[in-house]
From Swiss-Prot:
Xref: InterPro entries: Metallo-B-lactamas, RibonucZ/Hydroxyglut_hydro, RNase_Z/BN
Names of the cofactor(s): Zn(2+)
Residues that coordinate or bind Zn(2+) 1: 61, 63, 152, 220
Similarity-based family: Belongs to the RNase Z family.
Protein name, per record: Ribonuclease Z
PANTHER family (alphabetical): ZINC PHOSPHODIESTERASE ELAC PROTEIN 1
Enzyme Commission numbers on file: 3.1.26.11
Subunit structure: Homodimer.
Annotated source species: Clostridium perfringens (strain 13 / Type A)
Active site feature: 65
Keyword Membrane: no
Gene Ontology MF terms: 3'-tRNA processing endoribonuclease activity; zinc ion binding
Length: 316
């Protein structure tokens, strides 16, 4: 099960009813943060989201409405008692920006691992942390993070998160591979173990792969040819909808953003299950006023609001 909370749905500048861009994902008690605009900390407190268990922070690009909440958040995480490493993923330039932030944060009790312009990252989700791993054909990860270069006025990344579902234990397979019973539980947890000089792997006791959960996130950008394939069959697609009306198309083109309808068209092409719009222009008082026109293109579309949640479950 994956819990998703929109912490901030505004673009450009914070508004009384909308903080700036941020989303938090919670999987098995471990958290991933997508962007960190102003107000992120406040929204996390309002929504009861803990700070200490944030393991990965994904930044789309380096415009202020997506990163200005980060220095304060990193400080608060340090004050929460966290000592485990945190991964920060972002576009070219993210390392320099973070190093600048660290001038004001010289005593963080944890290490920041900055992954610049990276893709196809594999992670294991453990009870105490999420950990980057190098895989081989015998061990599968719990989480894959893929990135896609977008079309914005600053280097910008879209993100796709694929959460694998644990395979069922296969007794016949374990017996066929002559795996000692005392190792079964460890192998079911995807651990590599040895006994009497013999190595045993999880594939020796587990059945076929089952359908996992996919969440995709793209902001800020114009529509591109690569986005539909990147978001294909996502259970949830969170996408910018900076402008609600097609009358603002000239602004969308000039500022390299999207209208609601353009986002809906991407969702339709990508065959996603649900489109959740975010990153609304300060000129939009009520995004829901513009939803119906976009629903002519893609029906299962909603205008997100701060604090809105989704729960994505594994399905057989």
């Amino acid at each position: 099960m994956l819990n998703v909370t929109l912490l901030g749905t505004g673009g450009g500048m914070p508004m009384p009813n909308r903080f700036l861009s941020s989303v938090v994902m919670n999987f098995n008690g471990r958290k991933i943060l997508l962007d960190c605009g102003e107000g992120t900390q406040v929204s996390m407190r309002v929504n009861g989201t803990g700070f200490k268990s944030i393991d990965i922070i994904c930044i789309s690009h380096l415009h202020g409405d997506h990163i200005y909440g980060l220095p304060g958040l990193l400080s608060t995480i340090g004050n929460s008692g966290r000592v485990e490493d945190i991964y920060i993923i972002g576009p070219n330039g993210i390392k320099e920006v973070i190093e600048g932030f660290l001038i004001t944060l010289p005593y963080l009790p944890y290490k920041l691992n900055i992954l610049e312009d990276a893709s196809n990252l594999e992670f294991m989700v453990k009870k105490e942390k999420i950990e980057l791993v190098e895989l081989n054909e015998k061990i599968s990860s719990d989480l894959t993070i893929e990135t896609l270069g977008l079309d914005h006025s600053s280097p910008c990344l879209g993100y796709s998160f694929n959460i694998r579902r644990g395979r069922k234990f296969n007794v016949e397979k374990a017996l066929m591979n002559k795996v000692p019973k005392e190792l079964w539980s460890k192998l079911q947890r995807n651990e590599e173990v040895s006994l009497n000089g013999v190595k045993y792997y999880s594939y020796m006791v587990l059945g076929d792969e089952r359908k996992g959960i996919k969440l995709s996130y793209t902001t800020d950008t114009r529509p591109t040819e690569d986005i539909p394939g990147f978001i294909k069959e996502s259970d949830l697609y969170i996408c910018e909808g900076t402008y609600g009306s097609e009358e603002d198309m000239h602004k969308a083109i000039k500022n390299k953003h999207m209208t609601f309808k353009e986002a809906a068209n991407l969702a339709k092409k990508g065959q996603v299950k649900e489109l959740l719009l975010t990153h609304f222009s300060p000129s939009i008082n009520d995004p829901k006023e513009f939803i119906n026109n976009a629903r002519e293109v893609f029906e299962n579309l909603h205008a997100g609001s701060d604090g809105e949640e989704r729960v994505l479950n594994f399905k057989e």
